[in-house]
């Protein structure tokens, strides 16, 4: 371990370390630092959170006070929610105090042998499809009899699983986590796609893409070639092995589709993996997710048979293109996890005729190009949430014949006073102290049912975050499912 010690500097036994954020990530960081022998102090903006840690014997401080005394600490380990422009990271940078994320800490401790023989990390990132792809990858590794752990932005933090025996880690990472993990060098890393998202955190699309590209600095870089922004990252990847995947026929060094089969020409001359029609995730997005997962599995020598076995038995996660009901010839699909325009477009394109329930918080992203590409799939739209006007304006430009209904509430960020655009229908929701999200979704589903005909799909694929009207994307999806069940009863 002594040879690996420099990788841990400035972390050392007894070193004062500031842990920024007291959520799930913060708890995992505290446990790891205590195990290592460091002297952690936790900061958070929520007094109730701090009181809970004080009761557990943890030294605590407010975030503002921590920023004022930042030079007392040898290191800051931050939760991914802290943007680099937040006062605390800025104070650390000005004082020359390094800032790591929890993934950076996990990577350095693992490489240093702190948890035994280092694992081989297989990392998935991208604007959309991360969770499905990582879950597929883990299933492939498990089907091959390999000891794999699923972690990161899905399930448990990486730090929470490192004390479990494993050869491989199937890791989903967000752009926030990757920004704070500059030394990460995985065995294999995949960038599925790049679209406008989290620009309020990163500042620019270039900075967002640069964070995603960090997974390409290990041994094998895997990139979705059908996405121009992602494909552009392959030429600058540091990985010595570079692999692309596409929906079309693969060239040498790629995975793709030929004759209705997924084919590997990167890790074999010409290896058939599985039939496209065995992939349970609908539409092109399901094929792309399976190709990316297969590429990472193949980079650690998983044969074709367990890859096919894993896909055939794979089940889509909750709120990810989940069919919640079929009634009167209309299919109701919950894709509440489609929290940005790129994801919503992929979801809409999986079905031939769609009544689209959309809206929420766009986080600075434009929806115009995506609406233009999906316009011919839409037979109706029901718009909810704070940023629904932007969606409505895109629909008026690119799908002017598609009927649009606005669901308006008094609590909807003052949107009652906003002029209704282009003569759209309006459903007003009166919120009398009950569940606002449930009321909104009940009205949205009722409007969508009125627009839908047999053979249509009523699709919740919002293109925005949910926090204006819901506790999270899962809460939004549950509200949709409950509203559908009530409507078809």
Swiss-Prot record:
EC number(s) on file: 6.3.2.9
Annotated keywords: ATP-binding, Cell cycle, Cell division, Cell shape, Cell wall biogenesis/degradation, Cytoplasm, Ligase, Nucleotide-binding, Peptidoglycan synthesis
Record's subcellular location: Cytoplasm
Substrates-to-products reaction catalysed: UDP-N-acetyl-alpha-D-muramoyl-L-alanine + D-glutamate + ATP = UDP-N-acetyl-alpha-D-muramoyl-L-alanyl-D-glutamate + ADP + phosphate + H(+)
One Gene Ontology CC term in the entry: cytoplasm
Pfam family, one: Mur_ligase_C
Pathway this chain belongs to: Cell wall biogenesis; peptidoglycan biosynthesis
Residues annotated for ATP binding in this entry: 126-132
Top class in the EC scheme: ligase
Entry's Gene Ontology molecular function annotations: ATP binding; UDP-N-acetylmuramoylalanine-D-glutamate ligase activity
Biological-process GO terms, alphabetical: cell division; cell wall organization; peptidoglycan biosynthetic process; regulation of cell shape
Function, as annotated: Cell wall formation. Catalyzes the addition of glutamate to the nucleotide precursor UDP-N-acetylmuramoyl-L-alanine (UMA).
Protein family: Belongs to the MurCDEF family.
HAMAP family linked: MurD (MF_00639)
Protein name: UDP-N-acetylmuramoylalanine--D-glutamate ligase
Species: Mycolicibacterium paratuberculosis (strain ATCC BAA-968 / K-10)
Lineage summary: Bacteria, Bacillati, Actinomycetota, Actinomycetes, Mycobacteriales
Gene that specifies this protein: murD
């Amino acid at each position: 371990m002594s040879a690996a010690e420099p990788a841990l500097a400035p972390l050392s036994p007894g070193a004062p370390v500031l842990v920024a954020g007291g959520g799930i990530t913060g708890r995992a960081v505290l446990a790891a630092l205590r195990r290592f022998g460091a002297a952690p102090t936790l900061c958070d903006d929520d007094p109730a959170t701090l009181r809970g840690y004080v009761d557990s014997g943890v030294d605590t401080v407010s975030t503002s006070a921590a920023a004022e005394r930042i030079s007392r600490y040898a290191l800051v380990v931050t939760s991914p929610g802290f943007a680099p422009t937040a006062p605390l990271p800025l104070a650390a940078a000005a004082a020359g105090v390094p800032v790591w994320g929890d993934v950076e800490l996990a990577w350095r401790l693992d490489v240093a042998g702190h948890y035994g023989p280092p694992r081989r990390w297989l990392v998935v990132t991208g604007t959309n499809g991360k969770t499905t792809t990582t879950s597929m990858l883990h299933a492939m590794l498990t089907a091959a009899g390999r000891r794999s752990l699923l972690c990161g932005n899905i399930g448990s933090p990486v730090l929470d699983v490192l004390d479990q025996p494993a050869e491989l880690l199937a890791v989903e990472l967000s752009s926030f986590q990757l920004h704070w993990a500059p030394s990460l060098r995985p065995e294999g890393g995949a960038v599925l796609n790049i679209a406008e998202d989290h620009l309020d955190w990163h500042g620019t699309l270039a900075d967002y893409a640069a964070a995603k590209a960090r997974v390409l600095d290990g041994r094998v870089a895997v990139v979705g070639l059908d996405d121009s922004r992602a494909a552009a990252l392959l030429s600058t990847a540091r990985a010595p092995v570079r692999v692309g995947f596409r929906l079309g026929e693969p060239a040498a060094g790629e995975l793709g589709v030929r004759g209705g089969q997924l084919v590997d020409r990167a890790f074999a001359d010409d290896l058939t993996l599985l039939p496209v029609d065995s992939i349970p995730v609908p539409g092109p997005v399901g094929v792309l997710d399976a190709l990316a997962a297969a590429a990472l599995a193949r980079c650690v020598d998983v044969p074709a048979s367990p890859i096919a076995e894993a896909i055939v038995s794979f089940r889509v996660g909750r709120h990810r293109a989940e069919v919640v009901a079929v009634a009167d010839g209309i299919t109701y699909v919950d894709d509440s996890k489609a929290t940005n325009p790129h994801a919503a477009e992929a979801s809409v394109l999986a079905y031939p005729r769609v009544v689209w329930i959309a809206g929420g918080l766009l986080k600075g992203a434009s929806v115009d190009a995506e609406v233009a590409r999906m316009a011919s799939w839409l037979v109706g739209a029901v718009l909810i949430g704070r940023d629904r006007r932007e969606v409505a304006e895109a629909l008026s430009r690119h799908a002017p014949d598609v009927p649009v209904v606005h669901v308006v509430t008094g609590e909807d960020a003052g949107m009652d006073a906003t002029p209704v655009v282009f003569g759209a229908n309006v459903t007003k929701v009166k919120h009398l102290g009950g569940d606002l999200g449930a009321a909104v979704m009940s009205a949205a589903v009722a409007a969508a049912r009125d627009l839908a005909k047999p053979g249509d799909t009523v699709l919740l694929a919002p293109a925005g975050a949910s926090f204006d009207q819901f506790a999270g994307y899962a809460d939004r999806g549950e509200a949709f499912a409950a509203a559908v069940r009530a409507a078809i009863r």
